């Protein structure tokens, strides 16, 4: 009997050690992801998509950006001040949400950007794809309230949760769980890049999934 109890205790101890190790691994993964997310969220992209060089001040520091260029800087959360062409604008960078794919742009020229819901799905009709990806408020051709897969942005400071930033290409394929049949990835475009991406006659893009699980 004692031998049986000892074996049971040893087995329980081994299980606890294994469970503890698994929990520790999970915690390390979560913490690592959080640190990576916070590190990326601390960065902001100053972007100049125009044909002219621009000069401005951010929090009292002078910057010059050549045409069609950008610069990545560290920008802390809180209030900041931008001075451009005699106009002073104050904006606030929010703290990122837990494990959020936070992305921010400083847009001195107030140029147009587009946040687009790219849908990847299996056996989806164009109507289904449009309904599932249209999560942003917009207006239809008659000016009535509607839902669209894109959101237009032109603020001095843009902060959004995205999967792909300005210079990151969307993949041709992504993994899609069988239980959902589709997934949506958010991509942020410069206005001109979005027009080229969509094409003159296209309204939406439906991409094929890979390794449907």
Residue ranges and their predicted role:
Residues 2-22, 28-67, 74, 85, ...:
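Short loop/turn and low-complexity linker motifs enriched in small/turn-promoting residues
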Residues 77-79:
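Extracellular Ig-like/FN3 beta-sandwich strand-entry sites
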């Amino acid at each position: 009997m004692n031998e049986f109890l000892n074996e049971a205790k040893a087995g329980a101890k081994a299980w606890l050690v294994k469970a503890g190790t698994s929990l520790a691994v999970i915690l390390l993964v979560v913490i690592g992801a959080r640190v990576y997310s916070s590190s990326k969220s601390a960065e902001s992209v100053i972007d100049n998509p125009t044909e002219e060089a621009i000069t401005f001040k951010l929090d009292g520091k002078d910057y010059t950006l050549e045409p069609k260029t950008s610069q990545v800087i560290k920008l802390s959360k809180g209030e900041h001040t931008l001075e451009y062409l005699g106009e002073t604008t104050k904006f606030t960078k929010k703290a990122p949400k837990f494990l959020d794919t936070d992305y921010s742009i400083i847009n001195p020229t107030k140029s147009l950007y587009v946040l687009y819901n790219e849908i990847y799905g299996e056996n989806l009709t164009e109507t289904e794809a449009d309904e599932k990806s249209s999560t942003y408020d917009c207006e239809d051709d008659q000016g009535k309230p509607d839902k669209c897969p894109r959101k237009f942005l032109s603020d001095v400071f843009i902060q959004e949760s995205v999967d792909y930033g300005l210079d990151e290409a969307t993949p041709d394929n992504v993994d899609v769980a069988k239980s959902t049949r589709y997934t949506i990835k958010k991509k942020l475009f410069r206005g001109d890049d979005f027009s080229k991406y969509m094409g003159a006659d296209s309204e939406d893009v439906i991409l094929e999934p890979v390794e449907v699980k």
